[in-house]
Amino acid sequence: SPDSRKVASCKIRPTEKRYVYYVESSPADQLQPKLHKQEYAKPGDELPFKVPCIYEVETGRAIIPSTELFNHQYHISRPSWDKDSRTLTFEYNERGHQNYRILEISAEDGTVRPIIEESSDKYVNYSRIYRHHLRDGKRIIWSSERDNWNHLYMYDRATGKPTHQITKGEWYVRDIIRIDEENEFIYFSANGVQTDEDPYHIRYYRIGFDGNGLTDLTPERGTHKAWFSRDMQYLVDV
């Protein structure tokens, strides 16, 4: 933890290894075929179970949370301490990929609560998840395909609810380039904003945290690849 008083770790319950087998029909070093096996978990197989835990450095006391909110896990990832050392956050991807949660563990008593929940009756595209905690500790920028397009939302951490949608429209946010917290701007790439050209052409944009002031930084027609200067005052576009 930032105050060096606690350590976060992960308790793992392993599972029996499962394999698939395949035949190499014409190996280079012999006439007979070879049988090979590869470790591979198939649909329905039990997966390793992970529990993020917190330990006090001085006393060795273990703070082990209830697993109720992350029981059916496909994967647990991105554990990170908050700067005040009071909580640990991590991402929970439910098996089946229809529920995705950002969970917070109290470093005092192990209480777990969701600060963001993403659900779909079809599929949560977890490969496109983006999360950024603002320095004020109160707001989180989050990406979601909940309206069938990938857009950015501002979340209130205390309530776990979105306060507003930052980007919106029938277009797709691709990558976040920079979060400028001082001036409250987001720099990002997107495709499909311009309805009169190829919807897969990528351009670069800037928008305010409040969702206002969308600015096209690469207005020329066509697809773009940009590199920004450190102060975000200049870009090289190819």
Model-derived segments and spans:
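Residue-level recognition of a conserved intra-blade site in WD40 beta-propeller repeats
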Residues: 81-82, 133-134, 178-181, 228
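Beta-propeller fold detector
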Residues: 63-66, 112-119, 163-168, 214-219
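A short loop-to-beta-strand structural motif that recurs across blades of beta-propeller domains
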Residues: 51-53, 101-103, 151-153, 203-205
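Short glycine-/Asp-/Thr-/Trp-enriched loop segments that recur within the blades
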Residues: 70-76, 120-128, 169-176, 196, ...
